[in-house]
């Protein structure tokens, strides 16, 4: 075959393949039209299939139009209603573990923040652990000196409850060295206190956006709860202190809606001292159990009504629950006055159950070690010493720290009452241990209908870390 014949043959074959391809495409179109015309209303040219995927960072709506996908990013749907939170507390027979973050153990080899003052608060959909970071990581040189309470590096951040305070899952909330946070059913509200001691400012964030501020009115370390604030029917309440930690200070209740302050009221408490209140909703009011850092080894009690009227006094029970404290047998109890001369103190909590009260305290009378919760019959209203239940959470061979309260809303549990819960901070490092840093992890417990065995859910990290040996 000469070259011309080869060219003609190749051209003929190519032309034949092109014609065959055109025929196949025509047949494909005819078959598709015939099939679609026989499917009735099941599929039509104007029909679409829409699928929505609720991802962590966005909601995707994927529209499938036969063999074509159109991806559209849409806004995350917001909750429509405020939480009620006017129900009574559920009766608790014991407290079961809800979560434990093991942050310090994980932080020996993971990217975990140096923190203090962790606390838990819940929305209708989830509970989150909030914490004050030191702007540094465990086992890193910047963790040196983090025993200090107030610095420009401290921030309020949060993770889903049970997660360690790690850099990959933490969400920024506010610049703060003192804070509170709560959810009204629609959005999170946070209050972060920062700035110099004499001119500190509290910034109120709502839905992640700063919307209001509170300036220091006494010029002496404006500070707040270090635990969950309380929202009832869309109004959120919290307590702040401004003034000395070891003598008479000034105390105020604040009320906000959608992050904007709509009311405040001074608390008249001459001779008494209020710090770091642990508050919860109960029967339409806010009940708080606080810290007396001046003289009392009994805890201040504050009950707030929606109109910002209040009653204030001390937990009546004849058993002291602050630290340091004296012997139980030597304590008489008072509903109106501070008792004891120990000074100092530690953040704590309690829950009213009718006239009875559940109260938490360190097991040690002199240091922040061990933790137990007691139920005292008639302890809310009388100087009762009648301990009807006790549960150990951390044994006295291990460090504890702050503790505080929160509740599980009925929207989350589908119960007709608010489940009482608490958290216990377990402080590690300075000043009790030979490290360059101070941080903490936490255990979280919630009320159940059964008694729960004693155990020790302690921190468990083996110290010192590598950074402490350099």
From Swiss-Prot:
EC number: 3.2.1.18
Enzyme class: hydrolase
Region (Hypervariable stalk region): 32-86
Residue sites binding Ca(2+) per the record: 292, 296, 322
Location(s) in or outside the cell: Virion membrane; Host apical cell membrane
Gene Ontology BP annotations: carbohydrate metabolic process; viral budding from plasma membrane
Positions in the Virion surface compartment: 36-470
Superkingdom as given in the UniProt entry: Viruses
Region of interest called Head of neuraminidase, as start-end residue ranges on this chain: 89-470
Residue numbers binding substrate: 116, 150, 275-276, 291, 368
Main location: virion
Glycan-bearing residues: 46, 54, 84, 144, 293, 307, 398, 454
Active site: 149 (proton donor/acceptor), 402 (nucleophile)
Residues in compartment: Intravirion: 1-14
Activity regulation, free text: Inhibited by the neuraminidase inhibitors zanamivir (Relenza) and oseltamivir (Tamiflu). These drugs interfere with the release of progeny virus from infected cells and are effective against all influenza strains. Resistance to neuraminidase inhibitors is quite rare.
Coiled coil residues, start to end: none
Region (Involved in apical transport and lipid raft association): 11-32
Entry keyword set: Calcium, Disulfide bond, Glycoprotein, Glycosidase, Host cell membrane, Host membrane, Hydrolase, Membrane, Metal-binding, Signal-anchor, Transmembrane, Transmembrane helix, Virion
SUPFAM superfamilies: Sialidases
One of the record's GO cellular component terms: membrane
Domain notes from UniProt: Intact N-terminus is essential for virion morphogenesis. Possesses two apical sorting signals, one in the ectodomain, which is likely to be a glycan, and the other in the transmembrane domain. The transmembrane domain also plays a role in lipid raft association.
Reported function: Catalyzes the removal of terminal sialic acid residues from viral and cellular glycoconjugates. Cleaves off the terminal sialic acids on the glycosylated HA during virus budding to facilitate virus release. Additionally helps virus spread through the circulation by further removing sialic acids from the cell surface. These cleavages prevent self-aggregation and ensure the efficient spread of the progeny virus from cell to cell. Otherwise, infection would be limited to one round of replication.
Family: Belongs to the glycosyl hydrolase 34 family.
Name of the protein this chain belongs to: Neuraminidase
